[in-house]
Amino acid sequence: MANALASATCERCKGGFAPAEKIVNSNGELYHEQCFVCAQCFQQFPEGLFYEFEGRKYCEHDFQMLFAPCCHQCGEFIIGRVIKAMNNSWHPECFRCDLCQEVLADIGFVKNAGRHLCRPCHNREKARGLGKYICQKCHAIIDEQPLIFKNDPYHPDHFNCANCGKELTADARELKGELYCLPCHDKMGVPICGACRRPIEGRVVNAMGKQWHVEHFVCAKCEKPFLGHRHYERKGLAYCETHYNQLFGDVCFHCNRVIEGDVVSALNKAWCVSCFACSTCNTKLTLKNKFVEFDMKPVCKKCYEKFPLELKKRLKKLSETLGRK
């Protein structure tokens, strides 16, 4: 053993070992105690903990900064298993159903209106609009189209027109707490909502050549009422400003709002002039400033120079690879 150590050399400095010197053995590799350090910061490993990547050893902090992705939910670095979903990275325990909070890592998920849902929740959401109504008078299932009276569903044949006495159909109209057949109702000159096809007794919205209940004149994308705010029309549908521009115009990558005025086009994205800034120090940038892309966001030259050397090498290599494509 003594003869073996006499001929052994330090893996880092290639120097020999003194007879009584303390030696660090890491997976068969021998080091002087002062040579067993992080490849990035050259400091000894706290509590002996290190991470190895491509033959180099790093302390936990530098390994996270250089190689570990950040969790979209908690913002912490991910060491170990990474879930890649919805264009983001997640800890397995952080990737949960948006409705019931069930962990999705091992059971799979379904995209639903921008949400990640477990299959039971997705199926319930999908089936919500497929269920049949129950008559609030006889409590039997309504197989055909229901008559909605005071926000409750009924079989139409339970009612008669308050004017002519005819048995009603699902086309009946409610006015001031009474039900009327369609011909009798139309003779009263009451406006009909373009969405629900029911009479409008209160405020009327006149738009797109039709009349609407205030709460029924909504954005075709988010279904929120306009409530007097400006709407934008396209192919017979109305959109709020945000979703009209999101679907047919420019939305700022940073603030996710409609870009009013000049658009900064950089990194294959659109930005408000006031939002285009260094993602590290928030210094405002223009296209005349020098900046680099990091995590799909701009970083000014001053902040870039403070990056660890290994990280800058990675970014340069990535930039050269993309430039050749």
UniProtKB/Swiss-Prot annotation:
GO terms for cellular component: focal adhesion; plasma membrane. It comes from the Eukaryota. It is found in: Cell junction, Focal adhesion; Cell membrane. SMART domains: LIM. Its main location: other. The keyword Metal-binding applies. Within the IPP (ILK-PINCH-PARVIN) complex, binds to F-actin, promoting F-actin bundling, a process required to generate force for actin cytoskeleton reorganization and subsequent dynamic cell adhesion events such as cell spreading and migration. This is LIM and senescent cell antigen-like-containing domain protein 1. It comes from Mus musculus.
